[in-house]
Amino acid sequence: MIAKSRVKVYRYDPDRDSTYRFDTFDVPVTEGMTVLDALNYIYENHDSSLAYRWNCRAGQCGSCTVVVNGKPAAACRSQMPRDGEVSIAPLLQFPVIKDLVVDLRPGISRLERTRPYIQRGKTPERPEKLLQGDIEPMKELRKCLECWGCISACPVVAEAWYEFSGPTMMTKLARLALDRRDIEERVKMAFTDGLYSCTTCKTCVEVCPKSIDIPGKAIEKLRVYAVKTGLGPLEGQMAFLNSIANTGKSVDRTSTPLLETVPERVEVPNPVDRVAFFTGCLMDYRLQNTGRSIINTLRRNAVEVLVPKNQSCCGSPAFRTGMTDLAEKQAERNVKIFESLGVDKVIVGCAGCGLTLRTNFEETMRRARGEGLRFKVYDFTEYL
């Protein structure tokens, strides 16, 4: 028996409808069937007035991108569930022309303003020489399909597109800023277009069909250049950065820190494991009870916990704002402290610290010594 899925499709024709609606269709699902296949089936067998875009059917053009079950995705690469329900809607932030077809001009006009092509000062000699080292930094950014899924998903764009031009534009600007052939002031363009408005939440990465790390490979790279040219960081960010530089913590002390109330070594009889605990600034200065609960839970599970008193801020605020000198100093300092403990696992209770240790610390140490971390980083719940 052929499985069937219920497909709810957004319908709206501004020439005829006062508001949108969802029409539901039963679609037989075969192995390997995609959302685009389902739309084609609906068009051919149920309603030929359904409007939607598609072209290559190979995940290379981005034209079929729609919102599938609440997340932007390429219809041609999204698998249909068997015996399930699928909701298909148009991309957010763009005016609907009809049904799933949106007017992309609000995004395209912003893209045009950035002049997303190489600006040269003179005609290059031919053949033009490009070394692998010149290409590598922008290689991932060149994969962008301009599908606009990241614009649809970005929470900052949803609230203030007038202030932040969005992930697509930042990807283009970063690619050109990293291209030695381009002479345009791309960093200044990015700064004017809200470079520091991005929260680096990585929602854009989750929906990107090419999995481009836009916050890491574009936004934060542009912020590094912004700092070097004197555009960044923003005035409001300096208090946290100065605090890290002066005290080793990103926030002020308001009560007795966690590190002053717990032993450096929490011993247990017959330990099943031995780990180190990275508190981070907030666990040490604001969420002391949470930190104590983590240590006590590990202890009750027969895990010996080392809590070095000389640990300091992971440097996340510095990494995120482009202050690489301060950020890498914090990374190297903390890595030295935790590697000296001889443990192979470091536990974190803060998601921001965990991300910084896993990604930024790893990258920093590889650049500094040609080798990554000698311990593995676990979120507390992940470790349990």
State what each model feature region is.
Residues 2-25:
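Eukaryote-biased recognition of intrinsically disordered, low-complexity regulatory segments
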Residues 30-38, 79, 257:
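Short, structural beta-strand-to-alpha-helix junction motif
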Residues 33-48, 89-248, 326-333, 369-373, ...:
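Ferredoxin-type iron-sulfur electron-transfer modules in oxidoreductases and energy-metabolism complexes
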Residues 53-59, 348:
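Active-site nucleophile and cofactor-binding loops and adjacent substrate-binding regions
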Residues 67-70:
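Short strand-turn-strand beta-turns centered on an Asx-Gly dipeptide
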Residues 82-86:
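A short, basic-hydrophobic beta/loop patch
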Residues 146, 178-312, 316-365, 369-372:
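Iron-sulfur-cluster electron-transfer modules
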